[in-house]
Design a protein with these regions (language model features):
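Aromatic "clamp/platform" in nucleotide-sugar-dependent glycosyltransferases that forms part
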Residues: 315
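Conserved donor-binding/catalytic core segment of Leloir-type glycosyltransferases
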Residues: 4, 224-240, 246-249, 262-264
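Short hydrophobic beta-strand element within catalytic cores of glycosyltransferases
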Residues: 332-335, 345
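A short, well-ordered alpha-helix in the C-terminal region of glycosyltransferases
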Residues: 350, 361, 368, 375-390, ...
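A short helix/loop element that forms part of the nucleotide-sugar donor recognition site in Leloir-type
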Residues: 52-58, 211-224
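Short alpha-helical donor nucleotide-sugar binding micro-motif in glycosyltransferases
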Residues: 294-295, 302-307
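Glycosyltransferase donor-sugar binding loop
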Residues: 44-45, 205, 233, 260-275
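Nucleotide-activated donor-binding/catalytic signature segment of Leloir-type glycosyltransferases, i.e.
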Residues: 273-295
Length: 415
């Protein structure tokens, strides 16, 4: 099968969707011998879509682990120009505001639709909304009469990003839609998409590297003592709850003053706010915090193995792949009662849930794990078993492939 994946970023770009498409693409090549090509941008993250000053990857073609990758240059200046007008239009709920939001978010990629339309694929699959390349993939597929599968990564609680009627019109025109959780699937169906064309596939993780890394080895690598470590490992963004975690830790340190805090993620614009919050903390607390920016995928087993409690108090996620990575390292997790997260974490069985932006509840959950380390380890091990049974990349890639084959079949019947 000749597959074209269209996505906003690809390794060494960092992000959940970036990793998902990378690992699914590699598994399709290695497991099934499929011919997989990825069309993507030359940006390291989504901020590059509207900020022309950020560093870029080299545009052009390369091959990574058997996957052919073509990086297209992004025109950031147009998106940058409408960043302020779209904020005003959104605030005033003007009728054209969702189009301005789409343009401001980008990525604007000259020539992408034409390249998709001309590419000799059996199937075209694109990830993720609300970004512009999704429409290029759909229109390119329709113009070349090819089946199109859309993978949205929708988290409905993000009104700015996902309260856009054009997203659901596009999904209705696709051959199949892939969702990360049943929560997302139900929401898309509520927007009028036919249930028989919505499939839950989930996301995955490679458990083996996490098995081979000891906690002692990982803590030593990052310069931690043997005291417990609370960790956040993921994208630094406004909705991810890093600021809430820092506020919660001031309460934790009143009871457990020796606990260390690891904050690891890509150095985004929000990282400056995180640094400002840390700067305002008392010196005794600052010494307990380690910031670790722009880590590679290869470092993840070390990062997750170094923590004793994984706190990821994000306000909305389409899944939250970081929970799987923590479980792969047998760590207990804390998430928020928001979006798809309660469909991922079984509360009291493999993790705990708290209210979004509630620093008191988050602190109490962290303290509960620190006071009951044997119980915390039990929850982490239950999470690991869940990963092994349902969320390996091998299993997830098989689900993607089954949908691709069915999409090709259905498209043939319809034509």
């Amino acid at each position: 099968m000749k597959i074209l994946h269209v996505t906003q970023g690809y390794t060494p770009a960092i992000g959940g969707t970036e990793l998902l498409i990378q690992r699914v693409s590699e598994e399709l090549v290695q497991q099934f011998g499929d011919d997989v090509t990825v069309f993507t941008t030359n940006c390291f993250n989504g901020e590059g879509f509207f900020n022309p000053k950020l560093p870029r990857l080299q545009p052009g073609n390369e091959e990574i682990n058997g996957v052919k990758v073509r990086r297209f240059p992004v025109n950031s200046r147009i998106s940058q120009m409408v960043r302020f007008p779209q904020k005003v239009a959104y605030r005033l709920n003007l009728p054209f505001n969702e189009y301005l939001r789409t343009i401001s978010g980008g990525p604007i990629i000259p020539g992408l639709k034409k390249a998709i339309q001309e590419f000799p694929a059996d199937i075209i699959a694109a990830s993720s909304f609300p970004l512009l390349h999704m429409y290029a993939a759909l229109n390119g597929a329709r113009n070349s009469r090819k089946p199109c599968v859309l993978h949205g990564g929708i988290h409905p609680d993000d009104d700015w990003a996902f309260q856009r009627s054009r997203i659901y019109r596009a999904i209705a025109q696709s051959t199949y839609y892939l969702s990360n959780t049943k929560y997302e699937a139900d929401y898309v169906i509520q927007q009028g998409v036919s249930p028989e064309r919505v499939v839950v596939v989930g996301v995955g993780v490679d458990p083996e590297p996490f098995e081979q890394t000891s906690s002692t080895q990982a803590k030593k690598h990052f310069g931690f003592e043997e005291q417990p470590v609370v960790g956040f490992i993921g994208q630094f963004g406004g909705h991810k709850g890093v600021d809430t975690l820092l506020q919660a830790m001031t309460l934790v340190w009143e009871i457990f003053p020796d606990v260390q805090l690891l904050l690891a993620g890509a150095k985004t614009m929000f990282a400056q706010k995180v640094e400002n919050i840390i700067h305002q903390l008392p010196e005794v607390y600052k010494k307990q915090i380690k910031l670790y920016y722009n880590f590679s995928n290869e470092e993840k087993p070390l990062l997750f193995s170094a923590v004793d409690v994984f706190a990821y108090p994000s306000g909305f996620e389409s899944f939250g792949i970081a929970f799987l990575e923590a479980w792969a390292a047998s760590k207990p997790v804390i998430g928020c009662r928001a979006g798809a997260i309660p469909w991922v974490i079984d509360e009291g069985k493999d993790g705990l849930l708290v209210d979004y932006k509630n620093q008191q509840m988050l602190a109490e959950a962290i303290i509960e794990f620190l006071k009951n380390s044997s119980w915390a380890k039990t929850l982490g091990e239950v999470g690991r078993q869940k990963v092994l049974s349902r969320y390996t990349w091998s299993k997830v890639a098989q689900k993607f492939r089954e949908v691709y084959l069915e999409a090709i079949k259905q498209h043939g019947i319809q034509n």
